[in-house]
C-alpha cells in the first residue's frame, strides 16, 4: 500500500532561490514557459516566465544540448544549467543552459507578442484574448497587487477579531431591493442573484460579533461606463457593539493603512513595474454630504442639480477639492440622505432626513458604501412600513432583530475599483480578471 505524506521537495528551484545568491556557480533545474527568445547567432537568450517573474537563460551553440530552431515561444520547458551572476541580466543572475527538455508546445502561434512591455492592442481585443493577455508581466502585476489588497483585508480583519464567513449568492429576496436584479428560476420557484451579502452579514453579527466576506455580487444595471460591472468582488465586513458609524470608518482606515504597508513590503516589484505611488492614508478627511456639495458648488461654480445623491462629476470634484486643500487621496462623505439609502440604514436621530452612513471616495471615485444599521426590531418594522415595503421574504432576517441584536454597522468595498485607482487605470475592466458587463459573458 502507498501513502501520501504531504508536499515533497521538488528537484526544480524557483527564481527567488536563484536571486538569493545561494546557487551561484551551482547546477540547477528550472521549469517555466518560454516568454520570448532573442537569437543573437551563436548565443541566444531564452526568457522563462514563472509565477515570480522572468528569468534569463543563456543558450550557447555547441554547449547547450538542444536545437534552438525547435524551441517555440509559449512552450513549457525544463532546463538544467549553471547559475551565474551577471549585472546585465534582469535581477542580476542568469542560467547558462546545458540541456532543455520540452514539456509541451503550443498548437498555434500566439495571436500577438505578449512579451512587449505594453500590449499594442485595444481593451476589447485584450478581453477577447484574456487568458493570453494576462501572461503579459505588466498585466499580471495588476492582479498581484489586487491579491495584496485582498490579503491585507483578510489579515487585518483577522487581527481585529473578525470571523470569515461564506454566504449564499442565490436567494428569494435581495437586501438592496429595486429592479436591478438578475432573476432566475430555482426549481420552479422565483429567485435572484444577491446584490449584497447584507442580510447574512447582519445575521452573523448576532453569532460572531464581527464578520467579513470576500465574494462576488451581482447588479443587473444597464450601465456601460468605465466604472460599472454587472458582477464584481465585494470586500464586506459587519461589526457589532459599535459606538457609532465612525467606528466603521476607523476600521476601514486601519485596513487601508495596514494594506499600504503590506503592498510596500511584499509587492515592491509590482509597484515599481507599474509606477505606482501608494496613496496617503495616515489620516482621511470626513465631510457631511450636504457640506461637500456646497463646497464643490462654491469653489467650482457648479449648480447643485440633485440634492439627494452625488453625481459622478461631483464625486470627482470632491476628490479634487480635498486633494488641493489638504493633499488627501481619500475622503469620507457622511450623512447621506435617508431617501437614497436602504431601509436598514440608521437615520440620524438629530435629523432623520439624513442617515448615519458614508461613502469613501478615492481620487474622486466611490469605492465604499457603509454605515450604521438599525438594530431595533420595531424601528425596522416602522421604516419598512413608512417606505411602503412588504416584509414578505424577510421573515428570517427580521427574526434576528426580534430576538436581540447589538448596535452594529459595516461596509462593502469594490475590489476592482480600488485596484483600478491604485494602479492608475481608468477603466474597471482593466482590473477585472474576466469582466461581466452589458455585452460580455465570455471568456
Q: For the regions a protein language model found, what residue spans apply to each?
A:
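Short, solvent-exposed positions on alpha-helices
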Residues: 91, 160-163, 246-250, 392
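Extended, non-catalytic structural segments that build the interaction scaffolds
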Residues: 141-145, 276-281, 368
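Metal-assisted phosphate- and nucleotidyl-transfer catalytic regions
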Residues: 176, 254-360, 386-399, 403-404
Amino acid at each position: 500500500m502507498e501513502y501520501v505524506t504531504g508536499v515533497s521537495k521538488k528537484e526544480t528551484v524557483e527564481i527567488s532561490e536563484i536571486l538569493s545568491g545561494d546557487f551561484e556557480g551551482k547546477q540547477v533545474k528550472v521549469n517555466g514557459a518560454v516568454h520570448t527568445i532573442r537569437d543573437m547567432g551563436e548565443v541566444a537568450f531564452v526568457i522563462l516566465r514563472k509565477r515570480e517573474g522572468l528569468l534569463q537563460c543563456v543558450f550557447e551553440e555547441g554547449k547547450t544540448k538542444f536545437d534552438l530552431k525547435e524551441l517555440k515561444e509559449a512552450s513549457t520547458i525544463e532546463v538544467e544549467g549553471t547559475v551565474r551572476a551577471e549585472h546585465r541580466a534582469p535581477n542580476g543572475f542568469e542560467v547558462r543552459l546545458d540541456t532543455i527538455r520540452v514539456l509541451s508546445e503550443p498548437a498555434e502561434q500566439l495571436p500577438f507578442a505578449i512579451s512587449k512591455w505594453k500590449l499594442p492592442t485595444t481593451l476589447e481585443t485584450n478581453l477577447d484574448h484574456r487568458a493570453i493577455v494576462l501572461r503579459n508581466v505588466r498585466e499580471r502585476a495588476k492582479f498581484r497587487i489586487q491579491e495584496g489588497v485582498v490579503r491585507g483585508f483578510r489579515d487585518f480583519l483577522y487581527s481585529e477579531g473578525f470571523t470569515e464567513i461564506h454566504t449564499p449568492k442565490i436567494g428569494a429576496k435581495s437586501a438592496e431591493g429595486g429592479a436591478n436584479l438578475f432573476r432566475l428560476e430555482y426549481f420552479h420557484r422565483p429567485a435572484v442573484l444577491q446584490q449584497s451579502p447584507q442580510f447574512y452579514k447582519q445575521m452573523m453579527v448576532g453569532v460572531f460579533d464581527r464578520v467579513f466576506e470576500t465574494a462576488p455580487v451581482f447588479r443587473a444595471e444597464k450601465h456601460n461606463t468605465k466604472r460599472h460591472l454587472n458582477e464584481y468582488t465585494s470586500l464586506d465586513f459587519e461589526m457589532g457593539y459599535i459606538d457609532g458609524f465612525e467606528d466603521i470608518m476607523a476600521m476601514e482606515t486601519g485596513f487601508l493603512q495596514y494594506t499600504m504597508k503590506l503592498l510596500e513590503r511584499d509587492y515592491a516589484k509590482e509597484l515599481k513595474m507599474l509606477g505606482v505611488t501608494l496613496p496617503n492614508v495616515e489620516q482621511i478627511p470626513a465631510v457631511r454630504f450636504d457640506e461637500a456639495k456646497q463646497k464643490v458648488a462654491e469653489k467650482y461654480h457648479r449648480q447643485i442639480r440633485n440634492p439627494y445623491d452625488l453625481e459622478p462629476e461631483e464625486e470627482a470634484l470632491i476628490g479634487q477639492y480635498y486633494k488641493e486643500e489638504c493633499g488627501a487621496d481619500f475622503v469620507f462623505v457622511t450623512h447621506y440622505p435617508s431617501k437614497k439609502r436602504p431601509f436598514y440604514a440608521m437615520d440620524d436621530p438629530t435629523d432623520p432626513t439624513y442617515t448615519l452612513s458614508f461613502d469613501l471616495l478615492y481620487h474622486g471615485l466611490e469605492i465604499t458604501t457603509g454605515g450604521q444599521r438599525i438594530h431595533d426590531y420595531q424601528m425596522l418594522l416602522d421604516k419598512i412600513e413608512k417606505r411602503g415595503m412588504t416584509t414578505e421574504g424577510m421573515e428570517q432576517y427580521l427574526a434576528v432583530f426580534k430576538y436581540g441584536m447589538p448596535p452594529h454597522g459595516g461596509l462593502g468595498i469594490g475590489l476592482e475599483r480600488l485596484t483600478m485607482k491604485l494602479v492608475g487605470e481608468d477603466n474597471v475592466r482593466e482590473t477585472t480578471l474576466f469582466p461581466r458587463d452589458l455585452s460580455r459573458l465570455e471568456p
